[in-house]
Structure formats: structure tokens, C-alpha cells
Amino acid sequence: MTLLQIKTSKNTKENSATKSEFSCEFCSRSFQRETTMIKHLCESKRRWQDKDLPGNRIGFQSWVEFYKKNTTSKKPKTYVDFVKSAYYIAFVKFGHYCIGIKCINVNRYANWLLKNQIKIDSWCSDTNYSKFLIQFLKEEDALDAIARSIETTIALAKEEKIQSKDYLRYGNRNRICHLVTTGKISPWMLYQSESGVDFLGNLDEGQQRLIMDYINPEQWAIKFKRNTEMVAQVKELLNAAGY
């Protein structure tokens, strides 16, 4: 090989190395300049940049659980795996749906969807969330339910300029009914407080129909009968707080 051929070969290798020196870690596209590579924005890189959005975080965690339950792979999944997944859009959509409806317990809801083998395309269904919520309200810890209900009344009573203990007495009934259907005010508070019982007794037929599935009197009566010690504890707590 002549000296000219050696130099030409060396230059070719150097140019080749330069051309492939900067590449996108997401799509593997090569760039001659680092600045160009940094400015480059492929779909996978855009998804990575959105990783800290609350809805995206929920979507990622739900996707990880989905893979744990549906594959035998033991290799931990990363967010890079997630952004390249065919399920990315569906799970991010689910995450933002949970944020939008202020889902009571995202992990429990995701597990419920997986347990009931609900197709991912239906994870953002209001009907499915309502089914989950009705079941969840009857299964959750009573003190957690009361804590959430009290926090809700404190926040909204402040808006309506009334005392929190009087929220069920003087708050907007239609708004309270909506809070019941979203799980923010639990049947534990409605049935085990004086103001809650009065609230239920003053509802019109339309309001009763709206919340009936969430406060099913027969089912909750059975639950209370089986949990007499907790009922007594909840009653005492609510009475002491003036509810």
C-alpha cells in the first residue's frame, strides 16, 4: 500500500468516526455536531423529556405493574423501555385520566383493572372507575375514609364560608352528592354522623338516585353490623368533631 493510500484510508476512518461520534440514545440517529444532536428531538426523546409529568409517572408505574403480571421477564423495566413501548400512549393517557378525575387510589385502581382483565383501551372509562370506586369504598380502612371526608369538608367549608362540621348541614347539596360519587365523602361519614343522616334524609329523588349505588343502604347496613367496634370508634370521632 502506498503512502497516499494509507493517508486516504486513515482520513476515511477519521471522517467515519466523526460522523458517528454523536448519536441520539433514543433513536440512534447520528450527527456530525454535538449541538445538532442536542437540538434534535425525536418522538422517544420528547417522551423522555415528559417523564416528570404526574400523569406520565402514573402511566409508567402502571405499565411496570402490567408487565409484572403479564410477562415472565424478571428484568426490571426502565423509563427508556417505556418510551419505546407500543403501550406508551395508552398508559400515559391512563395516567392523565387519573389526574383529571382525582383518582382516590391509583395503585388500587390499576390493580383492580389488571385483576379484572380490563383491556387497556378501556382503562379510561368512567363506567369502570365507578365500578371500582363503589367496591373500594366498601373495602378501604374506615379511618382512612373518615380522614379523607373530613379533609374534604374542611377545604370546601372554607370556600363556602361555613364551619367544616356544618358542611353536610349547610353546604350545597348537589355539590355534596357529586363528592359522594367521587369518593371524597364516604358513606362512613354519611351514615355514622348526625349531620350525615340529616343530609341523606333531606335529599330529593334525583339526588337519591345519583348517589344510591355509592351508599347502598342494605349493603352498608350489613357492613356496619359486621364491624361494630369500628362503627363505635367512627361515631365517637365524628361526634367529638361536631359532625
Where on the chain are the PLM-derived regions?
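C-terminal recognition-helix end and immediately following basic linker
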Residues: 2-63
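Generic marker of "main functional regions" within proteins
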Residues: 34-37, 41, 47, 51-54, ...
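Charged, amphipathic alpha-helical linkers/stalks
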Residues: 49-92
